[in-house]
Structures are given as structure tokens and as C-alpha cells.
UniProtKB/Swiss-Prot annotation:
GO terms for molecular function: rRNA binding; structural constituent of ribosome. One of its GO terms (cellular component) is cytosolic large ribosomal subunit. Residues 1-59 are annotated as: Disordered. This is Large ribosomal subunit protein uL15. The gene is rplO. Pfam families: Ribosomal_L27A.
């Protein structure tokens, strides 16, 4: 077998049907669209969610709740991710940003207690979970709220 002799398997390359090319083709005249009507026209058909004039499901459902414009969006960091820092490091939001552990544009950083912390670190963040506070203290570090 040579590279120049490679061929696609049988049936892999199917020619597209050319619609409206005369009645002998089997796809002539109406080209598979049937006779007249909305679906036979170019651009014809109903929009997504249209139910023939009946009140659509999305509008039959009641409205609920509201968006709180004062909500704070915290970036979360797990304790196990802080093990990459050297012993005695002061972990601040700026340090986390430099290490690409959080993104820009968040209102604050919350440290969660998933995993184990193996080194004593001073962690400065906007919020801590209870478990995270305990584990940081148990490792000999400090949890400071900014």
C-alpha cells in the first residue's frame, strides 16, 4: 500500500443531491418541499418555540424570583490547591492571580476546606469556610479576613 493509492472506503463519500434539476432526477419541480404552503417557501417555517398561536410553554410558566444586583461573586480556592506554595508564604489575592488560580473580575476570594493543607501558610482572603479555618490553624498557619 502506498500513500498515493489511499482511497476512502466505499460509501464514505456520497454526492449531495442537486434539488430542482428536472423531473427525471426525482428531486425536480418541488424539490422535496411538497406543494405550496409556508414550508415550501424560501425562509419558510415557524420560529423556535412557536406553537401555532397557542400561548407557548415558556410564556405559560409563571415568573419567579429576581436578580439581586448587590450579589457578590467569590472565586473559590480549595485548601489542597494551596500546597503548591512554599512553607511560610503569605497567600494573598494578588499571589493567587499571579499563579492563575483565580481570574480577574471577581468580587472576592473564598477559601474552602476540600483536601488537606500540609504546610503552615498565612492566607489572606475575603471569606473562609469553617473547615478551611480549622485546617489552616491545624497546619500551623493563619487565616486572615481582608
Amino acid at each position: 500500500m502506498k500513500l498515493s493509492e489511499l482511497k476512502p472506503p466505499a460509501g464514505a463519500r456520497k454526492k449531495p443531491t442537486r434539488k430542482g434539476q428536472g423531473i427525471a432526477t426525482g428531486q425536480g419541480k418541488t424539490a422535496g418541499r411538497g406543494h405550496k404552503g409556508q414550508k415550501a417557501r424560501s425562509g419558510g417555517g415557524v420560529r423556535r418555540g412557536f406553537e401555532g398561536g397557542q400561548m407557548p410553554l415558556t410564556r405559560r410558566m409563571p415568573k419567579r424570583g429576581f436578580t439581586n444586583i448587590f450579589k457578590k461573586f467569590f472565586a473559590v480556592v480549595n485548601l489542597e490547591d494551596l500546597n503548591r506554595f512554599e512553607e511560610g508564604t503569605v497567600v494573598t489575592p494578588e499571589v493567587l492571580l499571579e499563579n492563575r488560580m483565580v481570574r480577574k473580575g471577581v468580587d472576592g476570594i473564598k477559601i474552602l476546606g476540600t483536601g488537606e493543607l500540609k504546610k503552615p501558610l498565612t492566607v489572606r482572603a475575603h471569606a473562609f469556610s469553617g473547615a478551611a479555618r480549622e485546617k489552616i490553624a491545624a497546619a500551623g498557619g493563619k487565616a486572615e479576613v481582608i
